[in-house]
Amino acid sequence: MASEILVNIKEEVTCPICLDLLTEPLSLDCGHSFCQACITADHKESTLHQGERSCPLCRVGYQSENLRPNRHLANIAERLREVMLSPEEGQKVDRCARHGEKLLLFCQQHGNVICWLCERSQEHRGHSTFLVEEVAQKYREKLQVALEMMREKQQDAEKLEADVREEQASWKIQIKNDKTNILAEFKQLRDILDCEESNELQNLEKEEENLLKILAQSENDMVLQTQSMRVLIADLEHRLQGSVMELLQGVEGIIKRTTNVTLQKPKTFLNEKRRVFRAPNLKGMLQVFKELKEVQCYWAHVTLVPSHPSCAVISEDQRQVRYQKQRHRPSVKAKYFYGVLGSPSFTSGKHYWEVDVSNKSAWILGVCVSLKCTANVPGIENYQPKNGYWVIGLQNADNYSAFQDAVPGTEDYQPKNGCWRNTGLRNADNYSAFQDVFQPKNDYWVTGLWNADNYNAFQDAGKYSDFQDGSCSTPFAPLIVPLFMTIRPKRVGVFLDYEACTVSFFNVTSNGCLIYKFSNCHFSCPVFPYFSPMTCKLPMTLCSPSS
């Protein structure tokens, strides 16, 4: 009953043109009402074709100025629209929300289901409509395809989401590691500065101790000198105030004593001759530290392998070597079999390793080519680049040296009668002449450039006995280049750059300062790490990166 009443009321407030509930209804003189938009559109169309205005239902003419809004119908239509749009009355059943009719048709243009009244309305006029049963299967298939496509896209989206999360986690880990590295690097830098500060303070304390000790001794000497003068002055005053006999008794001796008195000046130190403290070159220190970090990226896992009968004993883990005295008396050559080779050998690339030489008083380390290539036993006379050895060493706990090639054929360029200049000029094309002349033992402390690329320091020609006990001498001993160490190295880093033909040594204890570098090396065979503990019984130990 209520449904029939709603249908009847709906018919009263339905626009005859659009068949929809009235929107802003206008009433004509004949009493019929239409939507404002519908009657306006009909008025324009009728004026264009017929030239007069008439009601679309009864064709009774009307004047546009007589159109009046119908508030009553507008309110009824609005209330009815609210009732029809409620879920209980409209969408609960398959009925049109506007007309209350069953939704049996599908409008292809709008893509919506409509009722038969909607099909006849102006909104759907001329559109292609089908029964819902006819198009349901077609659109079900389309929706199934769309569903599968969306599921694939969903999987892709989930994968992208997972990738983003994985990348986010990776970045977090990377940034965390970078943060850890930054903290570690700057801690090392602070440790370097703390170490430099400690060294400077220790040097200053040693200087203070030495200065005060010397000045205290000078003070004691001055006190004794003053006391001696006071005694002599008292003797003179006593003689002058005493009798003639006291005056003349031994007068020549005391006059001679006063004449021989020499005022001893105290030992002092001029302030301008003191070593003036200067803050360390932080930029240079950072550069040195950076270079060490760069070469440490090429860390090689090196183990020790005896290459010949040797006095050197290797540990079970093949990471440590030490000297062991042989019971039998070795031959002249065999006594120098202290060295061992490292494994693996290198024929290309960059490689770095570190050796702990703490507290040792003697050692030799570096690289050498295969003994099969050189046919040389590792004696001191063969520690030369031309023989396939690029090494540095320590002797007598304090003498650090690098072993360079001996300079043969310089006997013809020995200076005669002190004519250094003339000899050098006559033989300017022969660099060996300058090497023989410009040596510290000849009062020359110089550096030089040769062939536009080779820079050299001129040292005294080495003698075989300089680095050993002198039991065996040879004119072909290597040129031993003294190395000055401000900080005694406990760990020495060795860096081989095969393609660049260089071997570099770093003082890891001194924050990676370069000790020595061999350039223009000729590697014609595989290159092996080389270690010699010499006759010092303390071990040499290969270090691990984590240590």
UniProtKB/Swiss-Prot annotation:
Organism: Lagothrix lagotricha
Coiled-coil boundaries: 132-224
Protein name, UniProt field: Tripartite motif-containing protein 5
Sequence segments annotated as region (Required for interaction with GABARAP and for autophagy): 186-199
Similarity comment text for this entry: Belongs to the TRIM/RBCC family.
Enzyme class of the recorded protein, top EC level: transferase
Chain's gene name: TRIM5
Pathway, per record: Protein modification; protein ubiquitination
Taxon lineage: Eukaryota, Metazoa, Chordata, Craniata, Vertebrata
ZnF segments: RING-type: 15-59
